[in-house]
A protein has these predicted regions:
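Solvent-exposed loop and capping/linker segments of extracellular ligand-binding repeat ectodomains
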Residues: 1-270
Length: 270
């Protein structure tokens, strides 16, 4: 652990000059006295473990200029409550390391247990396992230009009670929201053309859902069962939440054979 001093005075706030374009690996690692740092809009890369162990941070804003963030860049920032990011993972729209855990240097959400809010300001996709296992998150905001939500992207985000899915999203991956027990009402926009298997499995407190179609795909060529998006299990063939009462369908050209079979708890279908 380290601290920064100026004339024997502990520095708790730091403004990085606007001329800086790169923050190197371990640049501020272990500076436990820092409570606030302002990163200029010119910065394009943040290195591995750049801010690791900065336990004084509560809120962080990473500017949109940043295009890459190193592994474990914020590892050990255990008091962090909110972070604003230009994308999720290592690189904007990168094919690998697209999870929040990558920048926190941990797996399956075992990072900052105090983290409550994540605001994503850029990128066109939310990758597979992006927020998976972050049970303490209560607020996640994704940008309007996102077109895909990956496999298990929000799996087990039990603290989430609401998520606004922008009407630019076209695909939602398998198990994308499975285990999100905080959801009571969900609205899937008309822009979505495919929904993966068990995308909403384990959303046990869901009371209403609005969908652009019934089943897996808008064109009706794949599975057309309403239960498909809730998954199946060996002990319960139709894994639909017991409290689900209202289903609103806003699009699609047909309702498939036996689409709502064994959906006894639903009282309203529009």
């Amino acid at each position: 652990a380290h601290n920064l001093y100026l004339d024997n005075t502990l520095i708790t706030e730091l403004v990085i000059p606007g001329t800086v374009t790169k923050i190197g690996s371990y640049a501020f690692s272990g500076y436990i006295g820092l409570t606030d740092i302002r990163i200029p809009d010119n910065v394009i890369s943040i290195g591995d473990s750049a801010f690791s162990g900065c336990i004084g941070f509560k809120n962080l804003v990473i500017p949109n200029s940043v295009t890459s963030i190193g592994n474990a860049a914020f590892n050990g920032c255990t008091n962090l409550e909110s972070i604003t990011l230009p994308f999720v993972g290592a690189e904007k729209d990168g094919e690998e390391n697209g999870s929040l855990s990558y920048i926190f240097g941990s797996s399956y959400g075992a990072a900052s247990l105090k983290l409550k809010s994540v605001v994503v300001t850029g990128g066109t996709k939310i990758g597979s396992y992006a927020f998976s296992g972050y049970t303490g998150l209560t607020d996640i905001r994704i940008p309007d230009n996102v077109i895909s939500i990956g496999v298990s992207a929000f799996k087990d985000c039990k603290g989430l009670t609401n998520l606004v899915i922008p009407n630019t999203v076209k695909t939602i991956g398998a198990n994308a929201f499975s285990g999100c027990t905080g959801f009571k009402n969900l609205v899937i926009p008309n822009s979505v053309t495919s929904i993966g298997y068990a995308a909403f499995d384990g959303c046990t407190n869901l009371e209403s859902i609005t969908l652009p179609f019934v089943g897996a795909e808008k064109d009706g060529t794949a599975n057309t069962d309403f239960a498909y998006i809730f998954g199946y299990s060996s002990y319960k063939p139709y894994n639909i939440p017991s409290g689900l009462k209202t289903v609103s369908i806003t699009g699609g050209e047909s309702i498939g054979n036996a689409a709502f079979y064994e959906c006894g708890t639903i009282t309203s279908i529009r």
